Structure formats: structure tokens, C-alpha cells
Amino acid sequence: INKAIKESKIPGAVLWIEKDNSSYHQQYGKMCLTPAPKSMQRDTIFDAASLTKVMATAPSIMLLVEEGKLSINDQVTKHLPKFKGVQKNKITIKQLLTHTSGLPPVLPLKPEWKGYEQAINLCYSADIRNTPGRHFRYSDVNYIILGEIVKRTSGLSLKSFSQKKIFVPLGMKDTGFTPKKTKIHRIAPTTKEKGKLIHGVVHDPTARAMGGVAGHAGLFTTADDLAKFCRMIINDGFGADKKIFKKQTIEVMTKNQTSMFLHKVRRGLGWDIDSKYSSPRGDGFPKLESFGHTGG
């Protein structure tokens, strides 16, 4: 981390390493360099970007599975009747979770659009690129649709559902969508766009156009809160002295669900097991015995 900071690859970072009952939590460098340098803090809040998929969206879907409100083998049209077409009618929730739906990677930003419902309509009209179940393509569109399924099935927005069912029970007090302005001093900016610093709002342009709440991006969190979430996953769904998920649910989420691709791609339900996106795991995590997520 210090080397990356010295080489100006990153301004700073917060590191959490945990094994058994020991943990290491430390901040490094700066949380921002402009308009004025500001030191990184252990409780700095970050734009979690694509971690939204595995911290909010996929877990919310699986909680609805536990509640008997849907099945991962359901066709998407069962829950979103407007999502239809010759090939689209075949797409299942599982294929959305594993990025094997055949849908495009992103929604078009041109011509310019704005609003959550507009994004959902663009998902409805998106063209299929491959036969569902035949090809792996990391896709934000998959998770935008999953976020809408959470909303339609539960009656709550993804923001409210994940807060109520996951983040509050785990004591993740600094995790959520659309952070309050009172926390702006703790939030690390991301980058500049058209000369303006992106700070306190989601960096992803599609999620921003949707109002900050989307299934693929938009979540903000801290290293401390992320550790609480990961600890719960590792402990078979048990965290903060309560059961968040059934053990079987965690096993299904972290098991290879794309065996049809033989050894080329291994994906769980949301989680990455072995694909071209797995390289950050380094040498410390066994290739087929670990899982994680970075993005695409």
C-alpha cells in the first residue's frame, strides 16, 4: 500500500486483515488530495461501487428465496412481466446472478436519460447478445434488474430492504445508499468529472442517473462495516450474535453455479470463484477454495 501511494497509484487506503480471532485495521495516506490534502481515517466512508452487487443485491434476493417469495430458477418475466422477448422469456434469476443471461454489460448513456424508471425501461428494451445460459459476461444490467425484482417482490426499495434485513441487524451503521450530507466530511471523493469532484454521490454514471440507488452500484461503506459483512458470510450467515442467513444459503451462494463452462469460469450467486476478475486474490487464497468480488 505504501508503495502504491509513493508511486501515486492511489492517494490512500484503509486495510482490514482478519484471521481466526486476530485482526489488523489501519489507515494509510490521504483520503483526498484535492482541493486540499486530507488524511485518511480508519472510519473513512468509501463508494463501494460493484461491491453493491454482493453486499446488497444478491443477498437481498437470497433472503427473498429464504422467505419463499421467489426461486433462483424463476424466469424473470414471472416477477417483471414487461421483461419479455423471444430469448428474454428464458432468462432466469440464477442467470442474472451468475452473469450468464446474455444481456449487455451496461445501459446506454446516450441519448441522455435520467430517473430510476427510465433505467428499468431501458433494461426491458435491452437486446440479448447471447443465448441465455451459454456465455459469461459481467453485466451491470443483470443487477439493475435484480434490484427491481427485490423492489417488486418485497414492496421495499433495495435501499430499504437491504438496510432493514442486512445492514442494521449486522450493526453496519455507516453502510447504505445515498449517504447523508452530515457524513460528507468522512466520505472519500472518487474522481473529477467535467472539472467537478465527485464527492458524497455515487461515482457510477448509471447509478447516479438512477438517483443513487441501483442493484449494480451505489452503496457506501467503511472497512469496519465491510469486515462485519464478510465475517457473517464466512461464519455461515451468523453475525452480530444473530442469524442473518441460513447456512445452506451461504453454501449455495459461494458454490460454483456455472459448471456448464467446465473450467473456464466459476461463479457463485454474485460471488466470483475463478474468472478473469479473480487476479486480486494473489497467492494467499486457494484457487478453488476461496471466493470474493472486485467488479468487472
Residue ranges and their predicted role:
Residues 292-296:
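Flexible, Gly/Pro-enriched loop and linker segments at secondary-structure and domain junctions
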Residues 1, 21, 45-73, 143-151, ...:
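Active-site SXXK
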Residues 1-48, 69-71, 118-121, 126, ...:
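Short, conserved catalytic-motif segment at the N-terminal edge
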Residues 12-14, 75, 135, 176:
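Residues at or immediately flanking beta-strands
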Residues 59-65, 80, 97-104:
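Generic hydrophobic/packing signal
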Residues 72-86, 168-170:
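Short, glycine/proline-biased beta-turn/loop segments that scaffold the active-site neighborhood
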Residues 25, 32, 86-290:
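Short, surface-exposed loop or secondary-structure junction motifs
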